[in-house]
Amino acid sequence: MVVSVRFFILCSFFSFIISSSIAHTSFRPKALVLPLTKDVSSSIPQYITKINQRTPLVPVKLTVDLGGGYLWVNCEDGYTSSTSKPARCGSAQCSLFGLYGCSGDKVCGRSATNTITGLSTYGDIHGDIVSVQSTNGNNPGRVVSVPNFLFICGSNSLQNGLASGVKGIAGLGKTKVSLPSQFSSAFSFKRKFAICLSSSTSTNGVIFFGDGPYNLNMDVSKVLTFTPLITNHVNTVSGFLGEPSVEYFIGVKSIRVSGKKVPLNNTLLSINQNGIGGTKISTVNPYTVLETTIYKAVADAFVKAVGAQTVAPVAPFGTCFATKDIGFSRMGPGVPSIDLVLQNKEVVWNIIGANSMVQLNDVICLGFVDAGSNPSTSKVGFVMGGLHPMTSITIGAHQLENNFLQFDLAASRLGFRSLFLEHTNCANFNFTSSA
């Protein structure tokens, strides 16, 4: 009986969100769109989006965390809104967050994490209006609103380390309260979202919530390759201890450099019973981080395939060349491809020169980081310094730039495509004209 009552309350809550959202708009959008800007003003590059929140509406800049579980916003820095409502202990709103605590005034809350710095603080759970643009996949459309969008109240200290003007973090992870889940519940569209990071600080990338088309001078949804998303049943990220991972993992079976298989300890490529190993995708790690033995094997194979002399490395990288020794083309630096082989040898994530290399004046480096020698680059998710990374391969943001990624949450699969292969890029969504 208790389970039935809780289920009824949960269903009623989702129905309330949906009906309330529709009440605030005269049509039901099939998809939403947000701009995504690369910001290098802080020590770690971040990818920033903007929503409108509160009453009256205020533009709020947020760092995007692909593997984040929720939205958190700094409530100490002038947060005022006539429509903000705390979530009461025992309510359906609280239960959506999984594990939570209750304060003396009967408001529920939980830990919020700054995944750039690793700092966590406890914050109350609130709901408030959020407004974003709809889209038909070709252009932005009408503004639509969710009147009771749930978030955690962060603090001034939690905001430290975020890019200039950013007030919180927008989580896109596998929870009931991430942005993709709340938007799809509010507007009853498909449980899909797509993200495309621009490599430039002067042009916008894009996030789509909902199904395609996704027009970036072509409908990218038509050219995607698919691979299953894998669940890691153990999560050691601060604020989620004891819960399954909310991050996105894929099954890398092997790595090739210039078409040749790199010898690896294959047990590192799978997730063990303690949640260690495997491959995840991250927008808060600026570069791909590899477990030490994987890094050394890949770097050695890469140097051999390039055939040029290495030079003194530039931190945080360990493998660098003189820029004059590397040619360039439309695909970026002319270096061998690094291929992540997925469920079979026909399904491959190709990492070409534009994504594998980082140019630093007269030096150009392999943009992969050794987790053992550079534990500080991992931020959260490393155990005992960095010699034992929780995840063997973390695909970082530089390797994601100008790659289109669609996350189909209902089917638990990832669609991906390098836009260099399609002669387009992530900055080609038309934000300037309306549908």
What is the predicted role of each segment?
Residues D124-S134, R142-G259, T279:
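Eukaryotic endomembrane system proteins
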Residues R28-V33, K38, T80-V107, F420-A435:
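Extracellular/luminal ectodomains of metazoan preproproteins built from arrays
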Residues D77-Y79, N136-G137, T201, P213-Y214, ...:
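Acidic glycine-/aspartate-rich tracts in secreted/extracellular proteins
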Residues V2-F7, S15-T25, D39, S43-P45, ...:
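Aspartic protease catalytic domain
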Residues G78-L99, R191, V220-L229, A297-F317:
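Cytochrome P450 catalytic domain signature, combining two hallmark sequence patches
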